[in-house]
Amino acid sequence: MTRFRYGIEHECALLRPDGSFADFTNTTFDELQDIVDALPEDPADLADLRVGDAGIKRKRWYVEGYERFDEHGALLRCVPKGLEIRTRIHPSVEAAVAALRADQQRLDTAAAARGLGVTAIGFNPVHSEYVVEPAFNAWERRHRRVTPEERTAHLHMVTYGPDLNLSWAGSTPDALVDAARKLTALSPYLVPLSFSSPFRDGGPWGGLSARTALRTGARPAALAFLADGVPQVSAEPSLTQRARLPPEVGRLEFKAFDSCPDAALYGELLSLLTGLVLDTTLPQRRTTPDTALHRHAARVGYGDPALRAGAEQALDAAAAALADRPADSARVESLRARFDRDESPARAMLARYDAGDTVAGLRRP
């Protein structure tokens, strides 16, 4: 049986003590780092998790933001966006989901002790643009041109989403790249399952995923991590990336889902991705995401019969490929039930908002 290992990276948004949305306009790095400082550090995490050049990512939790550097490349500051939780790499979907839940609970407790609430939403509901100020210096201008992702890194300051990671044991570079191309092609049919960004600029924007509408075309849907020395695929946005740690070799990272409030949904989506990687019947392949189709999906979701049919095809193919994996099969069956109900976090958020509840700091006038 093909073996996979799993990891989840989950971006968390925050609410201030008065219930307003916390972001780069009203929150400091030190304020959020104080939460991280209260959480435990386990040196064993470092075998699986990358610390990064700035040293901010020493724990499973870290302050997510936009780093600014001086003229010599030394870190000056990190403008905060929110907090991120990263799990280690686990041998099963169940273990990865359980780890995320446990670390989410620890984060919720530490944030509450400092007057902040943790929430899940795919897009900043108040500010839809982050402006880089002051302008880049010469070192930053060079640095931000290195990869397509560096050139568009400012976009992530208003979006929140997961990286769902599958480490594929024994995969070849060609198979890994082919799987990333398949997931990139199928992405517009899959992402409505996760949509959680129906608000922007202070209210509903008329669609279900402001995150998808903004990021697609500039940011990857899926990445394949290849060993050093293996040729990369030239694409913008990227399809491949050089592995920075040994555990990253053979990893598929799906990046197009919105942030989800339910860890169980992440588990179901990981099983869906597993089935799609194992599937041998679906012909769809793309090196870069279909921008127009993603943006259409961001607005209408499965209200479009063609998008709905594409999702049904993907769910059916994944279910067939998982026939000998009962736990994954059960999760995809649960996901299919959500799909049949046209259920998504965005629709639940809009229903609460219409009922007069406060959602991510917003309340209906």
PLM regions and their residue ranges:
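An acidic/histidine-cluster motif and surrounding catalytic segment
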Residues: 164
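N-terminal, Lys/Arg-enriched amphipathic/low-complexity engagement segments
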Residues: 104, 111-113, 120
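Acidic, His- and aromatic-enriched active-site or binding-groove loops in soluble protein domains
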Residues: 136-159
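C-terminal accessory/tail domains of diverse enzymes
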Residues: 1-98, 109-110, 114, 155, ...
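Inter-helical turn/loop segments and adjacent helix faces that build the functional surface
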Residues: 167-179, 191-197, 263
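Flexible glycine-rich active-site/ligand-binding loops centered on an Asp-His dyad
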Residues: 183-191
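Well-ordered, non-membrane alpha-helical segments in soluble/globular domains
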Residues: 99-105
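Short, glycine/charge-rich beta-strand/loop segments that flank catalytic centers
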Residues: 85-89, 116-132
